[in-house]
Each structure stands twice: as structure tokens, then as C-alpha cells.
């Protein structure tokens, strides 16, 4: 049986917040930050819901190294 995603709760909170605020990300920054904090606590690949943030970080690093 697969393990429960450790950051699933935070991802669900983001969905609830977005739905309650007409999908305005600016209104949900606090809950988005909580998910980022959760993702930072676990190794890469441990949480499926964190994969978007991991990809975002990889792209930022690639842009930095390419602009030198």
C-alpha cells in the first residue's frame, strides 16, 4: 500500500482557498507558503504534490546558471 503524501493536507487547503476566493492566488499566499514549507521538509520526490514546486526550482536554477 502506498504511503500517504505528507503534504496532501496543505495541497487540499490551497484548493479550498482558491475555490473560496474565485481562484485568485494572491488571496491564498499564506496557504501556498505552508505547502512550500511542507515540501522543504521532505526529500525531492517524496511528495507528489510538491513536484510542481520542485520543477519550478529546477527551472530557476537552470536560468541562473545559463545567464552567467
From Swiss-Prot:
Subcellular location, principal: mitochondrion
Every CHCH domain range: 4-46
Recorded GO CC terms: mitochondrion
PROSITE patterns: CHCH
UniProt note on tissues of expression: Expressed in many tissues.
Short motif Cx9C motif 2, span: 28-38
Keyword Disulfide bond: yes
Disulfide bonds: 7-38, 17-28, 39-50
Compartments where located: Mitochondrion
Transmembrane segments: none
Keyword line: Disulfide bond, Mitochondrion
Pfam families: CMC4 (PF08991)
Residue span of motif Cx9C motif 1: 7-17
Mitochondrion recorded as keyword: yes
Protein family according to the UniProt entry: Belongs to the CMC4 family.
Comment field on protein domains: The twin Cx9C motifs are involved in the recognition by the mitochondrial disulfide relay system.
This protein's name: Cx9C motif-containing protein 4
Gene: Cmc4
